[in-house]
């Protein structure tokens, strides 16, 4: 695994977006002052991959790494692994809280949930969170002590490799030993139940199976022969049935031969008359047209005769009307005088209408006058009553004011507010009692959940211990070779095989344990919060009770009755005041109405006198008209005038209308007569032309007189488009007849090939019998196979049980050794000695690459003294202590051991990157001179990306590749130099 690019925003000191490109870097330094955020770069890499940061704990809440004052966080890491590129992005928002994870492979997003990322990383890299955090950042200072302090060497190695948990392994081994013993006994009991399933029984069944298969083979051969014979018989039967059908059809066609002959004759006639059909059709068209024209001619001749009579009558009528019109012109002079009288009469009628309206208006004015007079008298009386009512109301109001005190009412209302406050506090007290009961119930329920979670956590810890025990047992065995002496128990290791260890399962269990621990902490926090809330509620309730007592002391006993009495008086007072204002206003309104009524009465009297004078003048004009024309009733006189005028006008109009209609009718008749005469002339010409054409066509038809005697018969004999259909039917008949005769001969010839074939029914019966036998044999064969398969499974299970029991006994031997012999710290010492040798050997390879002359060896242990590390010069084989190394050599030696531990921890994880926390202080003169040479040696001999975290400027400046972290107030920025 090699980082390619890191993007951060809102992460610890990196508030603003920062991008670190690792691709041009190989051996570099992360440079910056203390607190600038150097280690935060490695924290960001770890957080991007696993969502956790080691220094804040494995199950850290993201809010601890969120930059101060920021609401959102983003960390993204691009890395390569085994030739493929990956990207992991993590997003977090504080409110509303939300977190997301996205994973990409070669630019394509993978469907991986947040809780599946660590499992996916372990699958592709072989590194779980715990291992990754040990190998990503190595404490250089520890390796410096590792070299120089032999007494602390094993302790440091145990800490680096995580061997401090091996005592837990021993305890788990003891528990697992008991569990495995129980499992072995159960397997032995199951093995005992399978004792009757033997190989001999299997051989008997296999022999039976073989016999059945041979019998089946013979039956199948017989079946195949019968099937072939049955096929021949079915073919013969099919041919015989087909021959019968062909013979039947031939007879049917022979019966149709006479009808087909008639069709041939009909077709021949049609072909003979075909050239004359257009002539015959034209003759028929001429006959039809002549008939129509002659009918039309007769009709028009009759119409022309009638039309001539009508014209003569119309001329006579016109002459009579002209004479009558001349005579009636004298009456028009008298009409003018009549119209003058009628106009005068209309004027008199209008005057009479006006008189009628004036009479109605007079009555209305008289009524209005009486109403105005009555209204004035009523209002005068009501004004007097209003004055009396105002005086009575004022007297009542004065009496109420004497009983009601505004100051007392205000004081009591203030006390009433205290009563409302008392009721509010009593209600609040009741609500808090309900809240207390609810919280107490929730606390009890959450307590039960807490106990359940604690039990689940204990079960997870037990299972995790058992898995780790198995894992470490496997690790112990991996360091021993067959024939080695166990340094703990002294026994000989015989190379007993162990099953593969599911490291991924351990990682998942640890993750589940961490989640359960987090859940337990959250529940515990909730319980404490509930307890705080309960105590707080109790304090608030006590305070409320005291306040209630104080309020009760301040409120008088009969407060409500006293307020009620005063409230009634106040309401009565307000009502009387409202009435008084109302009465006063009403009195003012009535006085105004009285004045208006008096003015209205005077106006009505004046209008009444004027109206009477106008009526007298109009009546005089009507009387003068009647005397002039001696008229008794105006309606009768008007009617006689109108009748006389209407008679004169209508008579003259009638004469003119008749004249107009007759002239129009005469013109129409004349026009129609001309048209009829022209049409008759054209009809005569058409009839003559058609008769000539008919004679010519009949002469042409004389050539086929022996076939058809008339044009109609020619048309009927001609088939037209039906000729082709008739010809096709005749041809189909002839072809079918010949085809059936040929087919009959072919079938008769084929049937000769099937002579000697048995009857179909006999063969079918024999075939069905053989098939039944085959089915029975197949059924029997299946039963034997199933029995044999079951026996095979049982025998296989016996073998599996033998193998499982054997493997369990091997495991039991290992756990027995661990639980009984690896006591105290002997196991840790033993493993640490093995690992020390491996670390020294691996570091020696690196040191020789860096120096070209030196390597490490472990001295032999002496009584009371641990093995020590010495430096050996390859050219002279001279040995010297590591304390004799110069500053630059010590730096290279520490790096060698750092790389060695990283290799051992990462195993097959292909870790292509490493970060080292340098632990030297300021460089001495020798180191300053040699640092460039050292860095070049590391670049040349290590195929890894290596970063050293340093806060010492003179050390960092020696690197050509640098990541510089600079503090900018409350945030930091990063620059990459290469």
Curated annotation (Swiss-Prot):
Binds 1 zinc ion per homodimer. It comes from the Bacteria. Its cofactor is Zn(2+). ATP binds at residues 32-39. GO terms for biological process: DNA repair; double-strand break repair. Residues 440-542 form the Zinc-hook domain. Residues 160-421, 440-478, 510-542, 578-826 form a coiled coil. InterPro entries: P-loop_NTPase (IPR027417), Rad50/SbcC_AAA (IPR038729), SbcC_gammaproteobac_type (IPR004592), Zn_hook_RAD50 (IPR013134). Zn(2+) binds at residues 486, 489. Belongs to the SMC family. RAD50 subfamily. This is Probable DNA double-strand break repair Rad50 ATPase. It comes from Aquifex aeolicus (strain VF5). The lineage of its organism: Bacteria, Pseudomonadati, Aquificota, Aquificia, Aquificales.
